[in-house]
Amino acid sequence: MPEPGAGAGRVLGPDHPLAMRAAARLLLEQRKTLATYGQDGDPWAFVRDCVWTRDEVSGRVRRYPSHAYAELLVRRWQEHPLLAIPKSRRMVVTWLFVAVNYWLARFHANAKCAFMARKLGKTETEGSAELVRRAKFIHEHLPATFPVCEVEYSIGFLRFPNGSEIVALGEGEEQARQHTFTSVLADEVSFWDHAYETWIALRPTIEGGGRLTAVSSAGPGFFKDLVHDQLG
């Protein structure tokens, strides 16, 4: 007869057969997860299956919506290093490109990704620093089958163990000239005061083989000319 308290409350040591089988199953699941969503996997599958978002107004948390246009945008991001996308708030486009840049940094060593907005932001709820906070949110809400990945986070900065970084920058040519990036996400470009100068300063990113993605609500000026290929 089992002793009182035996069974459900028993703690198995790491060498117990049940614990070893559980560890082996977890390792197998992690390998499958990385094969499907990791460096050699599909970034759209990662967004569709693994990414949760948070509405910055209501605080509602939900899975990223699986719209056909979102997959198309990810495919365009994979194919074209220079991308300009008009958006509406309901399209959740900024979250989409935060997610694919997170995927790039998480699974590709020594990637340097920049999130740029009109202002850097003094807190993690403002400007481009808020975009980095979204990447941290995605990181914290991945499925449990992903291997543990300890990141370094501060306002406007996210660093991965593989040497990759996501950094927040405000608009401006001086900010852009200081670095060459693997990928840049430029958000709400229609409302930047120095959009053209920043764009020119980011040319080395494209010429060096990096990606530059500009997204914005519709508006006149530089972004409209960029979308319609009328910069001259």
What are these regions (language model features)?
Residues 2-232:
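Phosphate/NTP-binding elements of NTP-utilizing enzymes
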